[in-house]
Amino acid sequence: MAENSLSDGGPADSVEAAKNASNTEKLTDQVMQNPQVLAALQERLDNVSHTPSSYIETLPKAVKRRINALKQLQVRCAHIEAKFYEEVHDLERKYAALYQPLFDKRREFITGDVEPTDAESAWHSENEEEDKLAGDMKNKVVIAEKEAATVEELNPKGIPEFWFTIFRNVDMLSELVQEYDEPILKHLQDIKVKFSDPGQPMSFVLEFHFEPNDYFTNPVLTKTYKMKSEPDKADPFSFEGPEIVDCDGCTIDWKKGKNVTVKTIKKKQKHKGRGTVRTITKQVPNESFFNFFSPLKASGDGESLDEDSEFTLASDFEIGHFFRERIVPRAVLYFTGEAIEDDDNFEEGEEGEEEELEGDEEGEDEDDADVNPKV
């Protein structure tokens, strides 16, 4: 009977089980008192609690189903937003027609085809007293110069080198301009923005109008930027409005020997058999602003661009957008430098705000270490 009771899980087994449980509890206590183990466990818990995807995985199936329904709504919102931007593009086209007469008059003043009236040229500066003082000093200098040399004051036609000065003032553009580009850009008379016609795919064209010159025969050079305003089927939640997706340039009809986008190099070749040497000339690409009109093409055949090409294309898109949104509408302010000062002040404000926010975050970490604003 005793043997049967032991084999059936009698008192001896109970004692052994109790002993094992006690040992396990002691081992657990020892492990939980180890700082390294506790730190590792805490880090793991923190990572789980602060990762949104990990949190979503813990939710019941019914809740996940409702979240999927919210995503469906979000996609529909993205399509409505795309429609909104299409109508904004239509409004831009409408108001571009209202701006154009003013821009045409701007061109006439710049080129000197029309002289502004006294009423049109009247301007009251915010620093009127300083301007008056500067004007008085200037008048004294002019009078002194006239008395000394009796030279008639020059009165150039229009506003010389208006657009070229803008290129020099704006860093984004001046970085593209080489010394041999400068004489050509001095012939630039106007830059216009044209929007795509109603019902056509969204796009805009930059038109660079040149006076007759010794470099090329084109009166106008164009750059077309193609846009897309619809959510990506593969990633609809990334939609943030219209984006430039491709661009086309134009062919520049260079006059003989005037093409600044290529340079000619001479190379000597030696004949293997006869040992005679001949000199050959070869044209190779040359850095120039006018390469702007021969852009890279965005890959549309499934092949991806290399990193350098992607960067070049993105920079091109940024420049085109800057011409459209900033340079053309506010040209005179980039000529005088006032718009550049505004841009610089805005950038400094953003940096200061970022530094201040970083300081606030550090303070929050000290006061409440459990708070994570990203959760």
UniProtKB/Swiss-Prot annotation:
Residues modified as Phosphoserine: S5, S7, S49, S53, S54, S125, S304
Modified residues (Phosphothreonine): T51, T58
InterPro entries (alphabetical): NAP-like_sf, NAP_family
Record-level Gene Ontology MF annotations: nucleosome binding
Motif Nuclear localization signal: chain residues: 265-271
Subcellular locations according to the entry: Nucleus; Cytoplasm
One protein family per Pfam: NAP
Alphabetized UniProt keyword annotations: Acetylation, Chaperone, Cytoplasm, Nucleus, Phosphoprotein
Post-translational modification: Polyglutamylated and polyglycylated. These 2 modifications occur exclusively on glutamate residues and result in either polyglutamate or polyglycine chains on the gamma-carboxyl group. Both modifications can coexist on the same protein on adjacent residues, and lowering polyglycylation levels increases polyglutamylation, and reciprocally. Polyglutamylated by TTLL4.
N6-acetyllysine found at: K105, K146
Protein's GO biological process: nucleosome assembly
Top-rank lineage group of the source organism: Eukaryota
Residues modified as N-acetylalanine: A2
Described purpose of this protein according to its UniProt entry: Acts as a histone chaperone in nucleosome assembly. In condensing spermatids, mediates the loading of the heterodimer composed of histones H2AB1 and H2BC1/TH2B onto the nucleosomes, thereby promoting the replacement of histones to protamine in male germ cells.
Quaternary assembly: Interacts with core (H2A, H2B, H3, H4) and linker (H1) histones.
Family (UniProt): Belongs to the nucleosome assembly protein (NAP) family.
Name of the protein described by the UniProt record: Nucleosome assembly protein 1-like 4
Taxonomic source organism: Mus musculus
Gene: Nap1l4
